[in-house]
Amino acid sequence: MTDKVRNRVQCWPALAQESSCVDFIPARQGATCGSTVVFIPCCGLTRGRRVLCQWFPCLSGGCCSQESSCVDFIPARQGATCGSTVVFIPCCGLTRGRRVLCQWFPCLSGGCCSQHTVNIIGEPPRPVGAPSFEFVEFGRLPSILSTELKLFQRAPVPEDFGIYYEGNADIARQRWTGGEAKALELLGRRLKQEEEAFREGYYLPTQARPDFLAPPSSMSAALRFGCLSVRMFYWCVHDLFARVQANNQLKHPGGHHITGQLIWREYFYTMSVHNPHYAVMELNPICLNIPWYEAKDDSLDRWKEGRTGFPLIDAAMRQLMAEGWLHHILRNITATFLTRGGLWISWEAGVQHFLKYLLDADWSVCAGNWMWVSSSAFEKLLDSSSCTSPVALARRLDPKGEYVKRYLPELEKFPALYVHEPWKAPPELQEQYGCVIGKDYPAPMVNLAEVNKCNANKMNAIRQKLLDQGGSTPAHCRPSDMDEVRQFFWLPEDVAAES
């Protein structure tokens, strides 16, 4: 480090007062080898830039070609943490220097991470108490007015609005009941599940140990329709964690990650504000314009109807139609298969299908998840190399094929050896099991190994084109690291390796 640079760092006490996510300001537009890049923690970029301009006239439009050419970063103080002032001087391009810098600032490896944002914003308010209706008098409309307004004399059902059931009632196992009373009852069961997990030293039990056969314990539908306060759910889980820690003298790390999915929910809400094109690709400022395949055959219909020839995918899609529900992991694997991990069909088609049939469908959250899964947004780097194989995932999470057989009764006689790859069963056994592949159940519609390789090449070409043009993914918050991605996708090392 030169004395010149060291002295300059000591002249920035004002910058140490800034807070919030870390950003960088290049010494000039199109900064190249040898230019200065100043990393500052900026709550308001305008103020940060104004302060910097007092020390760097080049930021106001001048040129800073005389700066040192060494590759280095200088923290404003020793032991700098996320949010510290850093001077970054690349001589070999931003990539190498950024890699060095990320050792100090993990959030920079994928943009400003949501966990860091949450730490700055602080805890959400606690829920207010239930209102009292003791002295409230409710009026009643005259019957003639009720008739004139065409009010329902009972709670309406979907059929009253011309919406009719399209699934297979014979395989439907889960019926949902709305209302606050049922939501609080489900919350009580969910908290017992959370408590068991905390005692055993883990969290997010529905993801850490997913059970596709058990009754859903997710609170998403109750949150979606306002039957349960999201603040109540958040604080119930965190207060429970604190009690378990204290009562059992445990020292497991806590923090916002124990309710990580709620954080992503709020984050997707934030990203959709003032963006009417959030659920489509065109005119969406945070979405990459990927040239997806325009399906003119029946590929999209086969995916929707559960006729892809891959049992886990088909079972999930039929469960969706029958029950209006899918486990988070199944949503990800079916979405991946439709987009970058299989059919290369636009995520927009998937969003519309999920919004129509998912009971807990939420425009902001649903579209946000689809953009992420398809690598269209919220990605550190366009990638199709880590697509989980539906066959490998099925073997791990449904080893006996019980889930698959529940929603694909045509495969109920297939043993565990063949149930996830029924096309591998010898023809005579298929006859014996009463299900001939290609006749009673479809053969795989694609060769997974081939399409994964092809799709990975497409993504790599798109990424390289962006880099060649000096571009990058749209500016938005992304996962901090691979651990956060794995937690979101439930992507174990061994499953990824088999992909």
UniProtKB/Swiss-Prot annotation:
Its cofactor is FAD. Its main location: cytoplasm. GO terms for cellular component: cytoplasm; nucleus; perinuclear region of cytoplasm. Binds 1 FAD per subunit. GO terms for molecular function: blue light photoreceptor activity; DNA binding; FAD binding; flavin adenine dinucleotide binding. One of its GO terms (biological process) is regulation of circadian rhythm. The keyword Flavoprotein applies. Keywords: Biological rhythms, Chromophore, Cytoplasm, FAD, Flavoprotein, Nucleotide-binding, Nucleus, Photoreceptor protein, Receptor, Repressor, Sensory transduction, Transcription, Transcription regulation. FAD binds at R190, S218, S220, Q261, H328, D360, A361, D362, C366, N369. Pfam families: FAD_binding_7. InterPro entries: Crypto/Photolyase_FAD-like_sf, Cryptochr/Photolyase_FAD-bd, Cryptochrome/DNA_photolyase_1, DNA_photolyase_1_CS_C. SUPFAM superfamilies: Cryptochrome/photolyase FAD-binding domain. The keyword Chloroplast does not apply. It is found in: Cytoplasm; Cytoplasm, Perinuclear region; Nucleus. DNA photolyase domain is sufficient for light detection and phototransduction. FAD-binding region regulates cry stability, cry-tim interaction, and circadian photosensitivity. Blue light-dependent regulator that is the input of the circadian feedback loop. Has no photolyase activity for cyclobutane pyrimidine dimers or 6-4 photoproducts. Regulation of expression by light suggests a role in photoreception for locomotor activity rhythms. Functions, together with per, as a transcriptional repressor required for the oscillation of peripheral circadian clocks and for the correct specification of clock cells. Genes directly activated by the transcription factors Clock (Clk) and cycle (cyc) are repressed by cry. Belongs to the DNA photolyase class-1 family. Interacts with tim and per; promoted by light conditions. This is Cryptochrome-1.
